[in-house]
Amino acid sequence: MQREEKQLEACLDALISQVSDIKNSLVGFIHKLENEFDRLTWPSVLDSFALLSGQLNTLNKVLKNEKTPLLRNQVIIPLLLSPDRDEEIMRLTEGRVPVFSHEVVPDHLRTKPDPDVEELEKQLSAEAARITTEAAQKQVQSMNKMCSNLLDKISKEERESELGSLRQNKQTFNPTDTNALVAAVAFGKGLSNRRPPGQGGPMAPGQTGASGMLPSAAGMQQVPMSLQSNQQQQHMAGVSMSQGNQPGKMPSSIKTNIKSASMHPYQR
């Protein structure tokens, strides 16, 4: 007798512990649904359901254990009923049952479900008994097929989502080419000094380009193109004067206007 009582006490302690864990999980899940619904994600909800499912399976294992006595064979008899408020019952029930009186005892110590629930359970049991083994096997196979198709669709969506994220994160430029382009534009690194075909050859030092710019003074004041024409006019005038001073030759009747070179923009 004492051995059975000890087993019953150990079983009740284990059941109380498991039920307490399930209650805490439910309280936490309900708190999330009520206060954090805007930040909840499906993985978090599924984790909560998985935790509850595992705890319920553990509770079923405790109930189906060989060492667990059949609780349905145990009879619970209230030893004391009082209409007054009981603080100890308040503490044990966490404030849900303040009074253990004749009015609440039938509800809290009832071992049978409500009449409506009991009637519905009988109907479901009768329908299950009418189904043959072959029909039940077909229903199970159909359900398994539907679950497999659903899992395949979920896996396909997950793979497509992963591929889409990889395409979005794929690099579409070459960092080496970008750095080389920036260095060429900013510092002229890697640029060639050769002139394009169809233009003049390399210019001598001090010679102006086609645009009238000196090579050593890029970006500075532009040199007037009239400088070269003035020098040519001076040269032609000198030739004419020398020819006129030589004996035996007729003086040239061409008049040349000699302009001063003081207009040179780079006069020292």
UniProtKB/Swiss-Prot annotation:
Alphabetical list of Pfam families matching this protein: Med8 (PF10232)
GO biological process, one term: regulation of transcription by RNA polymerase II
Polar residues bias spans: 223-246
GO MF entry, a single one: transcription coregulator activity
Pathway recorded for this protein: Protein modification; protein ubiquitination
Residue span of region Disordered: 190-268
GO cellular component: core mediator complex; mediator complex
InterPro entries membership: Mediatior_Med8_fun/met
Subcellular location per the Swiss-Prot or TrEMBL entry: Nucleus
Coiled-coil residue windows: 1-26, 117-160
UniProt keyword list: Activator, Coiled coil, Nucleus, Transcription, Transcription regulation, Ubl conjugation pathway
Protein task: Component of the Mediator complex, a coactivator involved in the regulated transcription of nearly all RNA polymerase II-dependent genes. Mediator functions as a bridge to convey information from gene-specific regulatory proteins to the basal RNA polymerase II transcription machinery. Mediator is recruited to promoters by direct interactions with regulatory proteins and serves as a scaffold for the assembly of a functional preinitiation complex with RNA polymerase II and the general transcription factors.
PANTHER family cross-referenced by the UniProt entry: MEDIATOR OF RNA POLYMERASE II TRANSCRIPTION SUBUNIT 8
Family designation: Belongs to the Mediator complex subunit 8 family.
The protein's assembly and partners: Component of the Mediator complex. May be part of a multisubunit E3 ubiquitin-protein ligase complex.
Name of the protein this chain belongs to: Mediator of RNA polymerase II transcription subunit 8-A
Gene name tied to this protein: med8-a
